[in-house]
UniProtKB/Swiss-Prot annotation:
The gene is trpF. CDD domains: PRAI (cd00405). This is N-(5'-phosphoribosyl)anthranilate isomerase. GO terms for biological process: L-tryptophan biosynthetic process. It comes from Xanthomonas euvesicatoria pv. vesicatoria (strain 85-10) (Xanthomonas campestris pv. vesicatoria). Keywords: Amino-acid biosynthesis, Aromatic amino acid biosynthesis, Isomerase, Tryptophan biosynthesis.
Length: 222
């Protein structure tokens, strides 16, 4: 397949500064993510995210990330921030995830413990989350948070998925080209790979990351 006919979507997650969000829009990033998971160093309050949301460019999705938050907390974020997409990293089931009447992504932990001790299985995932807009495969272990800066073995990705998937976990400008060529994801999700410190993005790393994604898109796979 000629990658010039395909565009990998890009999501920058863990945003905490309006200036970083504006730069993401200028770079053509498809989505920015705010983290509301307890214990995350990138966690922001709903009011902070609402203020930063004003910096998003037109046609850029605003993603709200949760990990075992209560239904009331998710509802407050939906009401206050007005995200266009939800992302769940905990033990939330499909009924919970779809109860907010917004499209959602379900994160799948691919850390050393795998998914319940086993590799992810496409059929099981799709039966468990029939209403998800897509899956996100990250390197964290079950019950842990993302943004670890660690990769996982990409050969363990399940085959036969009928939903789009995003690749996350330790992706940066140095390896995103190889990651895309190896796995052909719908999109890539990066946080620590474009940071100086948790939540503090680096403009040079952001630009370089986008350049490498576009280079991969132009790579001839034939």
């Amino acid at each position: 397949m000629n990658r010039s006919l395909y565009r990998t979507r890009i999501k920058f997650c863990g945003m905490t500064r309006a200036g970083d969000i504006r730069l993401a829009g200028e770079l053509g990033v498809d989505a920015v993510g705010f983290i509301f998971a307890h214990g995350s160093p990138r966690r922001v309050a709903p009011a902070e995210a609402r203020a930063m949301r004003q910096a998003t460019a037109p046609m850029v999705d605003v993603v709200a990330l949760f990990r075992n938050n209560s239904k009331e907390e998710v509802r407050e974020v939906v009401r206050t921030v007005r995200p266009t997409l939800l992302q769940f990293h905990g033990e939330e089931d499909d009924a919970f995830c779809r109860s907010f009447n917004l499209p959602y992504l379900k994160a799948v932990p691919m850390g050393s413990s795998g998914v319940n001790g086993e590799d992810a299985n496409a059929r099981t995932l799709q039966l468990s989350y029939p209403n998800t807009a897509g899956f996100l495969f990250d390197s964290h272990a079950p019950g842990a948070g993302g943004g670890t800066g660690k990769t996982f073995d990409w050969s363990r990705l399940p085959t036969g998925l009928h939903r789009p998937f995003l690749l996350a976990g330790g992706i940066n400008a140095d390896n995103v080209f190889d990651a895309i060529v190896a796995t052909l994801p719908w999109g890539v999700d990066v946080s620590s790979g474009v940071e100086l410190a948790p939540g503090i993005k680096d403009g040079h790393k952001m630009r370089k990351f986008v350049e490498e994604v576009r280079r991969a898109d132009c790579h001839d796979m034939s």
